[in-house]
Amino acid sequence: MASKEILFDVKAREKLSRGVDKLANAVKVTLGPKGRNVVIEKSFGSPVITKDGVTVAKEIELEDKFENMGAQMVKEVASKTSDIAGDGTTTATILAQAIYREGVKLVAAGRSPMAIKRGIDKAVEKLVKELGTLAKPTRDQKEIAQIGTISANSDTTIGNIIAEAMAKVGKEGVITVEEAKGLETTLEVVEGMQFDRGYLSPYFVTDPEKMICELDEPFILCNEKKISSMKDMLPVLEQVAKMNRPLVIIAEDVEGEALATLVVNKLRGTLQVVAVKAPGFGDRRKAMLQDIAVLTGGTVVSEDMGVKLENISVADLGTAKRVVVDKENTTIVDGAGKSEDIKARVKQIRAQIDETTSDYDREKLQERLAKLVGGVAVINVGAATETEMKEKKDRVEDALNATRAAVEEGIVPGGGTAYIRISRVLDDVKPADDDEAAGVNIIRRAIEEPLRQISSNAGYEGSIVVEKVRDGKDGFGFNAASGEFEDLIKAGVIDPKKVTRIALQNAASVASLLLTTECAIAEKPEAKKDMPMPGGGMGGMGGMGGMY
């Protein structure tokens, strides 16, 4: 086991503090509309240029192990804020730095770190409550566009596209971000339920020009197992053919004799049909087939449920207004399922979302929910170069997260103003002693820091701006983009309340933990051993004197 180096008291906090500052100083140059970019070297490919706080934080590893501990703790603040709120990572980092910097001075002066932590916790609790009263719900598409614009670094195109996407697919809808082939950033909305499986044979195509199969008012058969024999399917096929309606077969697979017979019947014009593989795998496939059945008003043919393919009738099939199948995707538009059945299914999926502990499962459940109730929107991000594409995609994802947070918990004045507005409630906090009061004062000073930094990045004196904003009321604040003092809500400079809240809570949590640290332990760097000198001469060749 490698030997350890142990630092105590002032020395430990000093090293941690240096690490915190190195990371925070790299991150905070990105804050606000006039914030700068950071360029990050990559071991392969072109460098990344970003204005996203968490991307910068994640790249930082310091050589000194104790300094690195401090940096990693603050990195945790940025990551956690990004995971929960999706934005506000730079604000959270700046708050953590300010809380720790002020706290370290007081601990060095002999104050009790545990009492300071209690004071910090009381102050944050009070501020979070007040933030709730300051927040207003998002009223319209315009406000959503403003939030998206601010989070995307004042890019109105991105803000408007996100607002349009949210208007089309609703709160429950899924919005994904993809890389576009061209330079334009566009929005594509898929109506109805879409899943990523296409036709099993190109012979099913009805439009050879577009290479798609489009069926109007089709019956939809959902089968859990493979279909390889024709005899099981014959009864239901005959019933559908008599009614002269198209048929969509969604099964684990359709192969051999069954697929060949379907293709022949399609080519002869006996039956308009298309066969598609079921989406997903394992239990998720069963659940998705059930979703399709509920949406279309059909029944899943499953031996687990005691339903066999040879015994089903047309009454067990679902229907929809239209089904479009291409090489890679199937879209079911306007399924004929009963609204109460769909609502019950949605309620069940929501309960599963609340219960699951896996982020992956939650994401997949939300996708299923969106397909049932909302829809799916795809934002195709276009750019001239790969470097610009990465940077733009980051901004779109940030903006998307911020708008979701705003819809969830409402909005507050942006640009660091919300923290200044709520700071007055700190006068009502009742600390138990002077050390707790010092903790409250740390927060009072720290929450001014985001506004100071935004002003500083825009080329203004932070202290003057803070005083002027403090003298104002409600939404009055500093618009760093224009350099004006105005009503920020009217000017469209707004932040999601959730982002503002999470940034403060996470920053206070990690910074106060760092403050209560008295000892730091890290592995000693191994002393580099000098390489041994190569042996001289050609030893071992004696005894050759007898050669002439």
From Swiss-Prot:
The keyword Chaperone applies. Keywords: ATP-binding, Chaperone, Cytoplasm, Isomerase, Nucleotide-binding. It is found in: Cytoplasm. GO terms for biological process: protein refolding. PROSITE patterns: CHAPERONINS_CPN60. GO terms for cellular component: cytoplasm. The keyword Cell cycle does not apply. It comes from the Bacteria. GO terms for molecular function: ATP binding; ATP-dependent protein folding chaperone; isomerase activity; unfolded protein binding. Its EC number is 5.6.1.7. ATP binds at residues 30-33, 51, 87-91, 415, 479-481, 495. InterPro entries: Chaperonin_Cpn60_CS, Cpn60/GroEL, Cpn60/GroEL/TCP-1, GroEL-like_apical_dom_sf, GROEL-like_equatorial_sf, TCP-1-like_intermed_sf. Together with its co-chaperonin GroES, plays an essential role in assisting protein folding. The GroEL-GroES system forms a nano-cage that allows encapsulation of the non-native substrate proteins and provides a physical environment optimized to promote and accelerate protein folding. Forms a cylinder of 14 subunits composed of two heptameric rings stacked back-to-back. Interacts with the co-chaperonin GroES. This is Chaperonin GroEL. It comes from Nitratidesulfovibrio vulgaris (strain DSM 19637 / Miyazaki F) (Desulfovibrio vulgaris). The lineage of its organism: Bacteria, Pseudomonadati, Thermodesulfobacteriota, Desulfovibrionia, Desulfovibrionales.
